[in-house]
């Protein structure tokens, strides 16, 4: 009997769940998103009044509320399966929040530490290794894949396209599929 190929989007979202569930309780809650924001602020040395920090906090709060809305759960926490289903729904429903583009712009502004409107290899590697705890080799592979024009930087359009691909494409070789390692 043949086994079905794994659903790449589910695999990607399960990996992001594991990375977000830093207290390893099997659920995500608002505190997990607060810890994520704190990691970004710490890694990028952003104070609470920095506009990038405020934008990150505002987006993550809205994102969390959208996940809860789409999950239709009684508690303010999500299991892995509830998270995967909610992210899929929130990614497709842009009536209140365009998840992929909103996240892409907020993260790009944080990662682009020198504000030159492009992400250098070092900036991108820092993002995946220091914030998301990926191995440097995986971060460099992801960088090379996202740099679709080969200019050794990731432009805002390249980054946004990769974020969209992360949430919406089932192609394991798509640039956004490599954010949390090879699916």
Name what the model sees in each region.
Residues 165-183:
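Acidic/histidine-enriched, glycine/proline-rich intrinsically disordered or flexible terminal extensions
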Residues 4, 35, 60-64, 94, ...:
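Aromatic-enriched hydrophobic runs in primary sequence
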